């Protein structure tokens, strides 16, 4: 049966009855599908009536023209789960989403088009948006409230007023929605500064505001839309972490109670960002670069949210449940809510090793060019690039320069590590000299640590930008190995040593008796890299940088019996052992 969701005289109406949107953010792409029902059930049990999620173009269309809506990307299954639990849905399809997500959810292949302007009324950009929207919106359309589904609202772009003022572009996004049958309520969301709202709103589209404190900021919306409902599109209950930072604090339940009560005082709707944060699996995290410092986001997206990264309830959850019951007069559904069992499986020895340099053929085919290419020129979105060349003498000791490294490079001469250079950080010089008749193999392993997801430095190409010089002389003649690390099945392993200084994959087996439980992985003897569990990339670790010291291993990734753990260590390790513990360490 079709539903009616409208607004008038400062209020929302669902089927002609006054309605307050009490929403929480849960991103389907940050939580395993096996966990969606648990997280959504807890949202319902807390008294919420709506779930909000972004959609991530860069995973749904990793390769131009090739679409994927399976597994963790099965947005229809996520929506259907919410509908079955009688939750309404808010969808924020971008195309740009920010979200502390690589490139703000835009696919990296857009950067192959040098003359394309992003996030504006650029014909080429919109030409690339339309096929994605056709695929995505065809899946959303049956779930619109106007077709009897749960989707009440769909967002136009995302915080656009913080970036630009091309309202013609915003209208084009609206037009694409309407052409694809999206006939439900549309909205924009922006910060509360007037310059943000003036750049990011449209006269005929509902505007909502995003912030993390002082609810009365919402009243600024009245200057732009006097008779429309007040709504906070993102109320930030916590925050995210960057590598090299100490990490954010926890919001007090008392403070949260006061803010929630003020929303109800103003008859305002709200969306808690995040209700459940989840995880930046694989290489999907984004980065900030608003000043001079490049700041990549960590793997955990716990966000100090109402539910932890593992989906456990927190004091903020209990506070929200109490306030919502008191202010709505509706008792939260009597639904059994249970936190997952955590288990400390102990130490796992990684007994096998596959050196990166000896396994390149199984991971990638080389691309040859005179000048170093960027990841995007190599048709690569995530992972690493190995740049390989031969140096020939004679030349006196010269400093090795790279134009720009995005984002972290490890240098090897004849297989021996000679230095590391990292974007926006103070780096020691690397010097090389060769005599008559001497040659040297130079390898540069560059990691993409996450594309910028917010602000004016969004055009964040990866790899070596601007070439490599010895002193003042450019060096030409390169082999490049794009290393997406999508599949590690072809690696050839030998016996692992107890320590190592070259990049390598280390493999071991975790044996589980009985039903698997959630656990957390500590990698105390390791420096930097990523981990796969039974072939699934659970994300990056970076021990010297912190603050995150454990990686979340969700129970659905594990099985009774033998489980394969593969650690890729880029810098070098001191002990080939990982430890599975029962407590997360996010600020170690």
Region roles according to the model:
Residues 396-412, 442, 510-534, 541, ...:
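Aromatic-lined ligand-binding clefts that engage carbohydrates, nucleic acids, or primary amines
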Residues 1-50, 80, 526:
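N-terminal carbohydrate-binding accessory modules
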Residues 28-45, 64-81, 398-400, 404, ...:
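Aromatic- and glycine-enriched glycan-recognition loops and surfaces
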Residues 2, 91, 95-128, 134-272:
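Substrate-binding/catalytic cleft of secreted carbohydrate-active enzymes
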Residues 17, 54-59, 63-66, 71, ...:
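Aromatic- and acidic-residue-enriched carbohydrate-binding clefts of CAZyme catalytic domains
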Residues 36-102, 174-179:
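Aromatic-lined substrate-binding rim segments of carbohydrate-active enzymes
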């Amino acid at each position: 049966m079709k539903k009616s969701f409208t607004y008038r005289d400062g209020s929302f109406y669902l089927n002609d009855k006054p309605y307050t949107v009490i929403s929480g953010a849960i991103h389907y792409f940050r939580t395993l599908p096996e966990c969606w029902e648990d997280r959504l059930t807890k949202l319902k049990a807390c008294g919420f009536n709506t779930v909000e999620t972004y959609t991530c173009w860069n995973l749904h269309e990793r390769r131009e023209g090739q679409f994927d809506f399976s597994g963790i990307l099965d947005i229809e299954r996520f929506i259907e789960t919410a509908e079955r639990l009688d939750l309404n849905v808010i969808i924020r399809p971008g195309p740009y989403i920010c979200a502390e997500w690589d490139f703000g959810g835009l696919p990296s292949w857009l950067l192959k088009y040098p003359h394309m302007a992003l996030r504006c009324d650029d014909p080429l950009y919109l030409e690339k948006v339309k096929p994605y929207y056709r695929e995505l919106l065809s899946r959303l359309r049956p779930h619109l409230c106007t077709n009897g589904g749960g989707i009440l609202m769909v967002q136009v772009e995302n915080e656009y007023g913080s970036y630009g003022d091309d309202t013609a572009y915003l209208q084009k996004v609206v037009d694409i929605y309407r052409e694809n049958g999206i006939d439900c309520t549309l909205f924009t969301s922006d910060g509360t500064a007037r310059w943000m709202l003036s750049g990011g709103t449209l006269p005929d589209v509902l505007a909502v505001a995003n912030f993390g404190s002082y609810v009365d900021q919402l009243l600024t919306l009245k200057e732009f839309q006097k008779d429309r409902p007040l709504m906070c599109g993102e109320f930030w209950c916590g925050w995210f972490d960057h590598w090299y930072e100490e990490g954010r604090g926890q919001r007090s339940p008392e403070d949260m109670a006061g803010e929630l009560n003020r929303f109800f005082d103003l008859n305002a709707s709200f969306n808690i960002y995040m209700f459940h944060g989840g995880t930046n699996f694989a290489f999907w995290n984004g980065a900030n670069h608003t000043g001079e410092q490049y700041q990549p986001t960590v793997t955990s997206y716990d966000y100090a949210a109402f539910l932890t990264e593992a989906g456990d309830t927190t004091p903020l959850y209990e506070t929200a449940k109490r306030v919502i019951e008191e202010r709505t007069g509706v008792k939260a559904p009597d639904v059994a809510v249970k936190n997952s069992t955590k288990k400390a499986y102990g130490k796992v020895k990684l007994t096998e090793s596959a050196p990166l340099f000896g396994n390149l053929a199984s991971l990638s085919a080389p691309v040859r060019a005179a000048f170093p290419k960027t990841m995007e020129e190599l048709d690569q979105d995530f992972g690493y690039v190995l740049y390989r060349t031969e140096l020939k003498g004679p030349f006196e000791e010269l400093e090795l320069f790279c134009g720009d490294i995005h984002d972290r490079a490890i240098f090897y001469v004849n297989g021996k590590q000679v230095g590391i250079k990292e974007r926006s950080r103070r780096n020691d010089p690397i010097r090389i000299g060769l005599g008559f008749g001497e040659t040297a193999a130079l390898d540069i392993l560059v990691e993409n640590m996450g594309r910028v997801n917010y602000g004016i430095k969004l055009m964040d190409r990866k790899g070596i930008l601007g070439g490599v010089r010895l002193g003042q002389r450019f060096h030409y003649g390169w082999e490049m190995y794009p290393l997406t690390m999508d599949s590690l099945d072809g690696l050839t392993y030998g016996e692992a040593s107890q320590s190592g200084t070259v990049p390598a994959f280390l493999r071991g087996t975790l044996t589980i008796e009985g039903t698997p439980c959630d656990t957390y992985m500590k990698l105390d003897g390791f420096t930097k890299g990523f981990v796969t569990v039974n072939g699934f990339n659970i994300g990056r670790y970076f021990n010297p940088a912190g603050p995150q010291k454990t990686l979340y291993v969700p129970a659905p990734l594990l099985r009774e019996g033998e489980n394969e753990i593969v650690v890729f260590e880029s810098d070098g390790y001191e002990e080939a052992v990982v430890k599975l513990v029962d407590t997360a360490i996010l600020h170690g």
